[in-house]
Design a protein with these regions (language model features):
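Beta-propeller blade termini and top-face loops
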Residues: 1-193
Length: 193
C-alpha cells in the first residue's frame, strides 16, 4: 500500500525506482523520492480529474510528467511545479491518453471522442470522425512508429468494433477486431519483441 484509498494510476521513474507517484480517485497524487518512506502531494492547483485520471511520463524525458482534467498539465520536475498546456475542448475530463515515443504527439480521449496534439499538448485536432460512437478504453502509439495508433473500445455487444488501427496518426482507421469475442477490450500495448 502506497497511500490508501482506491489506487489508480502510478508511475515509477525508470532511472530511479525510489522516485514514484501514486494517484487516488479523481487524480489526487502523492510523490515519494525515497521508495515510499516520505510522501508529498503533487497536484496542480484546483485539480479534479476523472475517476481514473491519466498520469504518465514523457518517454523522451522521464522527469517530464503529464496529468489532465479537460486541460493538459505538464511538470518538467517530476511533479514539483506544473504548467497548464492547451484545452482539449472535450466535454468532461480526459479519460485516456498516450504519448508518442519519438515526437511531440499526444492522443487523448473522452467517451467516444479522440483528439491528437502534434505540438506537445498546446492544440488538439479531432481524429474520431470515422470511428465508432462507443466508449474508448485505451490508446497506444507504436513505439517504433509514431504514425501508428491503436484505439480500443469497451463494448459488450457482438458488433465487431473493438480495436482500430491508424497508420497515419488518425487520418484513416482500419478495424482490426477480427474474431475477438463479445467482451470489452480494456487495454492495448504494441510489443515488437
Amino acid at each position: 500500500e502506497f497511500y490508501g484509498a482506491d489506487g489508480m494510476e502510478g508511475i515509477i521513474h525508470p532511472l530511479n525506482d525510489d522516485w514514484m507517484i501514486g494517484s487516488l480517485q479523481f487524480g489526487g497524487k502523492r510523490r515519494t523520492k525515497d521508495g515510499g518512506y516520505n510522501q508529498d502531494g503533487v497536484n496542480p492547483d484546483d485539480f479534479s480529474g476523472d475517476w481514473v485520471t491519466p498520469l504518465m511520463y514523457d518517454p523522451n524525458d522521464q522527469m517530464t510528467i503529464y496529468t489532465m482534467t479537460n486541460i493538459l498539465y505538464r511538470s518538467d520536475d517530476f511533479g514539483s511545479t506544473w504548467n497548464t498546456l492547451g484545452d482539449s475542448f472535450l466535454e468532461g475530463n480526459i479519460q485516456n491518453a498516450a504519448i508518442a515515443e519519438n515526437s511531440s504527439a499526444i492522443a487523448i480521449s473522452n467517451y467516444n471522442r479522440l483528439k491528437i496534439s502534434y505540438d506537445g499538448g498546446m492544440t488538439f485536432t479531432e481524429i474520431s470522425q470515422s470511428l465508432p460512437n462507443q466508449f474508448i478504453t485505451d490508446i497506444a502509439f507504436d513505439p517504433n512508429n509514431d504514425d501508428t495508433i491503436i484505439v480500443t473500445y469497451g463494448t459488450y455487444g457482438n458488433n465487431n468494433q473493438k480495436v482500430y488501427l491508424s497508420e497515419n496518426q488518425g487520418e484513416t482507421w482500419q478495424n482490426i477486431t477480427y474474431n475477438l469475442g463479445n467482451m470489452p477490450i480494456r487495454s492495448v500495448v504494441i510489443d515488437h519483441t
